[in-house]
Amino acid sequence: TEEGLFRRADKAGEGFDLDVRVGDEIAPHLIARRLADNWRVLCAAPAYLAAKGTPRTLAELAAHDCLVIKERDHPFGVWQLMGPLGEESVRVTGGLSTNHGEVAHQWCLDGRGILLRSWWDVHDSLQDGRLVQVLEAYHQPADIWAVYTSPLASSAKVRVAVDFFRQYFAERYSLPE
């Protein structure tokens, strides 16, 4: 089923060697190795901003069409962000929501709303101008991790995979200053 595609897998019970995940919520019985520093940023298509205006404060997001993604363990429709005053939250709504990040990214490119998405995922769209970062002083920490169980701690294949992913992210994506 489609629901099965987006559930959290039982790595040990289902025979998975490695899980690559975004976010710092990792069960204590698992081993996690950071693959890359990452954060989620707010962005929108220039066409959306031209039609609806650019939010100037976090509170103004509540009046915008936001593209809400059901993330693993995050409250739906509540964006918790780090900003100039520390951690802040805003409740957001919009006509579109999904549990698939690529769908939300495409909606954002199509000018359907404001998106909170991982830097590595929207980096190219920001670089080529298809998306614009909004409220640049805000971000959500979301590092990228390789997660596995302790029986695989000395596995050569896991070590090679972790090294590959670290190099991949280091060569392609660096966070802005």
Q: Which ranges hold each PLM region?
A:
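Alpha-to-beta junction loops
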Residues: 13-21, 40, 109-114
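Ligand-binding cleft/hinge of the Venus flytrap
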Residues: 77-91, 125
